[in-house]
Amino acid sequence: MVLPPPDKRHVCLTTIVIMTSMAFMDAYLVEQNQGPRKIGVCIIVLVGDICFLIVLRYVAVWVGAEVKTAKRGYAMILWFLYIFVLEIKLYFIFQNYKADKKNLETVARKALTLLLSICVPGLYLVLVALDSMEYIRTFRKKEDLRGRLFWVALDLLDILDIQANLWEPHRTGLPIWAEGLMFFYCYILLLILPCVSLSEISMQGEHIAPQKMMLYPVLSLVTINIVTIFIRAINMVLFQDSRVSTIFIGKNIIAIATKACTFLEYKRQVKEFPQNAIALELQQNSLSHNQTLHSTQGIPHEPSPTSEILDT
């Protein structure tokens, strides 16, 4: 498939978000080292950033080219690459904070958490680029999809909150095995779950139906809403961790109840969905090419009553 010309604004915005977060990570790494070691770390991160920029120069352009299409394949590649590099730098920052037990400066650690909580969910929303999906014409469908994207961003904040528990100062530390398990569990979730969400959007195509995107809600229900409740409960009860976020525990309980109601409603709708409506949906998909031709010729296309029923 030949991609259209890239959206320059989207390419610039993606590059700014990525390189801003990477620059701050590098600043933390360099600042945590002293003497001759600081020069060596500075050279290493500089070489790494140059290599990353070379790759980003091509991938960001490909992402900007597909932003107005129904595909998000290059967006998944860029997300995977970004999180892979970011979490490696974050791991060394976390280990440096852990080794320097005398430095309990709270502001720098809180600033690191704030930076991640803005850049990571922000990049996900930029890669989805909902406002650039011109093929989504109905306001109701776009707002439904926007609500689902908000849940993904909220889940990313939930994961980052658990990771931040490792470098933000607290009275009692966790065992080494627990720290490593928590960090890499969050690492895997950050790598995979947003890619699952992007792949669902990509697989739906131009006839996207947010109510049919059920893979991500199921995975997040198990891996985030349920598992993170147990993680926080164990940290709070067994390890007496005073920094456990009870607000996110409440958020996950509400999310479990909400998703349970959604799954029950979806199951009921599938059972009651008439067979003739399925046939009409297939017929509508087969005529999509003709509808596209009419729209390019300036003929306004009014949504049929059948499509309105199928969107509900």
From Swiss-Prot:
Transmembrane helix in keyword set: yes
Transmembrane segments: 10-30, 43-63, 74-94, 111-131, 173-193, 219-239
Membrane topology: Multi-pass membrane protein
Cellular component, GO annotation: membrane
Region: Disordered, residue numbers: 291-312
Record's keyword terms, sorted: Membrane, Transmembrane, Transmembrane helix
Compartmental location: Membrane
Primary role: May play a role in MAPK signaling.
PANTHER family tied to this protein: TRANSMEMBRANE PROTEIN 121
Family of the protein in this entry: Belongs to the TMEM121 family.
Protein name (database record): Transmembrane protein 121
